[in-house]
Amino acid sequence: MAQFDAKIFNPEVFGKYVNRIPDLKKNELLRAGVLRTRNDLKAMLNEQTGGNYITVPMKGLLDGDPVNYDGSTNISTSSTKTYSQSMVVVGRAKGWKEKDFSADITGTNFMDNVAAQVAKFWANIDQDTLVNILTGIFAMTGAANEEFVNKHTTNITSAGTTTVGATTLNSAIQRACGDNKQVFTVAIMDSMVATNLENLQLLDYLKYTDKAGITRDLGIATLNGKLVLIDDSMPKTEVVTTAPVYSTQITTAASAGDKITIGSTEYTFVANSASDTGAKIKVGADGTAAQQATNIAAKVTIDGFTITASSDKVIFTAASATNPPMPTVSATKGDDGTIVIANATDTPAVVVYNYTTYVLGDGAFDYCDCGAKVPYEMDRDPATNGGEDILYTRQRKLFAPFGISFTKASMSSLSPTDNDLKNGANWELVNDGAISKSYINHKAIPIARIISRG
């Protein structure tokens, strides 16, 4: 049996230690019904070829119009549509060397210390997996898929009020699911969004009492009757609302032979009567700083910038919606040189963030811990660094968004990578597979998002 820091390692016992470490966020998602445990899928996966991809039937709802029951009108019949949903197992593995563990593992709490770190690591990975899936399904294309994306997205970044307010959440879930909006139970948001709501006194926090009898915040609140999980791993995108403007002022005009480096190119000032072919800039007929600034602006090009002249300044204006640093600009005097320059930021960039808040409802994801053949094991490398003990961990889990199939249209291995999950080409609304596809009603899908500036 393998040893870890001279301790006997029992993988089965260690697994029990890991499993009993509470994952508060996942527990809340389970309690709220967002993650619907489907242990039956594990058996189905074993029955289908490959064991990593499964297609299951999904029954449609009864529909159609009734006829008049008057004793003379024939009763028409219709059948419910049967859709099929495809799901994929996400496999991940990670190993650590003994010294990688930050906690002291030499004492009696060895199992607790290591198991707590391993449990926290995998809880974060599961959260990342969910976010990657959500990113992917909101990147779907095609008419039916885009109807879901558009209706289930509330983007207020260009509205009169760009931050989440008292009515934003309620309006967003109504836009997504109409009169089915009561299905939503949880909103997961960045702390910046939550702080804005706290300042408006719209959040009420849940609390728990620890073993020492101390009451603490769970980091979970409620808003409009929905649970609010605060997590800074939610997506946020940097947006440049004002691009920067930089300048180089020629405070003392250059003489022939002086040099100026702009970007990666060094330019030499030459007499006004000389050729300025190549990396050369004329000093100008009068040799003034203003003439030289104009000549520089006419000569120099730098990707991402528009270069102009204003009096004795060379102005570098960044392209819209970008935030590059100022190009490198320096000057070197020749033997009888005179040039002196001063660089400045005339207009600093204004950068804001677009925050994504996900709103999830009852049964938003089917969830199954499919298990790995060997989830935990130890190995010893006796040679490296005089001997190292290594803990290997593996997991296989299924997170399937309700009403949306993983198509594996762009996947190169049995387990999808993070990029595969984020790729909209790998997702589509559940449908009947016919040539002229009939899709599930998007209002049945309890998944929505709000994009805001806070």
Where on the chain are the PLM-derived regions?
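Internal mixed-charge
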Residues: T222-V239, A349-W427, N431
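Alpha-helical scaffold segments that mediate packing/assembly in large oligomeric complexes
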Residues: F101-G178, G284-A285, E428, A434-S438, ...
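Short helix/loop capping segments that flank catalytic or ligand/cofactor-binding pockets
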Residues: G64-V67, T106, N196-N199, Y205-L206, ...
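Surface-exposed, low-hydrophobicity beta-strand/loop segments enriched in small/polar/acidic residues
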Residues: N52-K59, G64-D65, T80-V88, I137-A176, ...
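Extended, solvent-exposed, turn-rich assembly/linker loops in the middle of proteins
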Residues: M140-K226
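N-terminal "assembly arms/tails" that initiate or stabilize quaternary assembly
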Residues: M1-M87, Q182, L229, G371, ...
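Extended, beta-strand-rich, solvent-exposed assembly scaffolds of outer structural proteins
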Residues: T241-N343, T347-A349
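Long, contiguous amphipathic alpha-helices that act as assembly "spine/axial" helices in icosahedral shell
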Residues: V56, K81-F148, C177-V193, P382-G403
